[in-house]
Amino acid sequence: MEKKVKYQQKEDKIIFFHIVMLQNKIKKIHPSNIAVYVGLDFVGDGLIKLPFIRSLKQVFPKSRITWIAGTHKSEFKHSLSPLVQGLIDEVIEEANVGFIGISDANFKQRINDLINFINPPINGRQFDLLIDTQTHVLTTLIVKTIKHKYFLSGTANFLFSNIKPPKNFVRELNLSQRLVQLAEIASGSKINVPPPPLPLDDKYRKLAKVALPKNNYVGIAPGAGDMSKCWHLKNFLDVAKDIVQKKRIPVFFLGPKEKKLLQFIKKEIPISVFPEWGKFRKSNIKGPAFVIALAERIQCAISNDSGTAHMIDAGGCPIVKVFGRSLPGKYTGLTPGSISIDSRDFGTTNINEIKPAYVNKILDGYFK
């Protein structure tokens, strides 16, 4: 079923971007290989970066892309690897680059960072274009020791970058959009982020179709890695009951930490579907790729600010996210029709002051 809620694109911004780019006559580059530096990638971090990766491949389709996690591991080499097949050619983890900007880095790690000025990291490999995604000054100085022809970094208003944005450039608040801006600056052109579906192995979508064969589903993701970001479970259950009353089917996304809620929710909302558990659970079909495939089959969703929310957004499902203490602007979903509800609009940072009835009215809008 086609999504009923449409997104109004800001075409004036696009036109303005093109005019400014022409005025500044930015030289376009054609890198045969690109390195992207990050400190690390947890699941949520990685999903926020996914629009940037797709945009980078869109504007540089023939370039080999190497993803460098300077200080820790990257989920793009693990649970998120199915999402970047054909987009990222190589992932280098724990490259020992960038510890100097981490407050809890030990003495040896900091010394190794300084050694990078003498012995360039990544075995001295050189890249045509090196993109630094973080903005800590000392870390950027270390990242620049990776050999390169062109360097792009937003640190200190692009002070260290030899590729500059157009004049009057305004950095986006949203983290995903901010990263996409780096790809725009590198290519010298405005980018329309490729919409879903993502390139997934067929096995994920086949199982998702078995689990969710109908078309009137509403996703519910009640968990979060940071429990202080969680709307109370009772609120989610009240929303689920309203969904059932309106002849729709609630689909609960429960991670390992929420498994203990499974039986309780089943008892409260018997009609609920739990596609990641029970008869649908497969050892080789799970994780973010499966959640994204499921999200392609639901009409809309409600969630906390969480990694699961980013997965649902990556599946192209409009999502309603509730926020309390954390600010919504940075983490608002990019899917057309997505909405953030900020408890500050109700005069408080207490997320539970957002009432289920208010959420129900918003969810109803996706079925009109």
Predicted features and spans:
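Catalytic machinery of carbohydrate-active enzymes
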Residues: E2-K368
